[in-house]
């Protein structure tokens, strides 16, 4: 999860500055649209996990996040920025929920608490290191390249999910 929250940290920290450099005005709407996507997905993701399995719901979430980062990197106007926010919120809402489910699925029942604790350590480390890494990248290469490079972490998360899931048909 740390690889995912690393990108989230960059999005939440630097979208206002990025939008300002693009002359897009009030980027606060980005976060409203992000929250709408997040809430919509979270309202239905539990049922989707039960019906289709964790992997079948995690992968589309990660694809949404990847698409959002691409749109964000190349945004030239507010509607594209807002679409990116919706996709990122939707993807993050799904990815966080499904990855937390995966962390528990890989643990024996007496270790569910430890699995959740470890999950959130990764979550918090991603946020902390993400802002630091994103700041360094944006200073060196600019916001657009920063968002493009951070896609690598979504790809790494995807590879790890595929590598360490209990089975392709796993459900909780």
Protein language model annotation of sequence segments:
Residues 35-43, 127-128:
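Residue-level signature of mid-helix packing/kink "hotspots" within the transmembrane helices
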Residues 56-71, 148-151:
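Structural signature of the two symmetry-related core transmembrane helices
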Residues 73-84:
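Helix-loop junctions at membrane interfaces in 12-TM secondary transporters
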Residues 109-119:
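Loop-to-transmembrane helix entry/capping segments in MFS-fold secondary transporters
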Residues 41-54, 138-139:
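Helix-to-loop junctions at the C-terminal end of transmembrane segments
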Residues 1-32, 38:
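Extracytoplasmic gate region of multi-pass secondary transporters
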Residues 136-154:
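A membrane-interface helix-boundary motif in multi-pass transporters
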Residues 94-107:
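Intracellular juxtamembrane helix-capping segments at the cytosolic ends
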């Amino acid at each position: 999860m740390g690889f995912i929250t690393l990108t989230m940290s960059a999005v939440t920290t630097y979208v206002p500055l990025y939008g300002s450099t693009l002359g897009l005005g009030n980027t606060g709407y980005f976060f409203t649209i992000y929250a709408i996507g997040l809430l919509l997905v979270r309202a239905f993701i539990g049922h989707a996990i039960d019906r289709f399995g964790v992997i079948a719901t995690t992968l589309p979430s990660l694809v949404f996040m990847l698409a959002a980062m691409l749109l964000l990197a190349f945004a030239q106007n507010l509607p594209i920025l807002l679409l990116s926010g919706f996709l990122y919120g939707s993807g993050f809402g799904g990815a966080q929920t499904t990855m937390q489910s995966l962390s528990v699925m890989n643990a024996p029942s007496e270790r569910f608490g430890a699995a959740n604790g470890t999950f959130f350590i990764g979550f918090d480390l991603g946020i902390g290191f993400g802002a630091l890494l994103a700041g360094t990248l944006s200073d060196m290469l600019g916001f657009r390249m920063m968002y493009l490079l951070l896609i690598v972490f979504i790809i790494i998360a995807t590879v790890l999910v595929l590598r360490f899931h209990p089975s392709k048909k796993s459900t909780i």
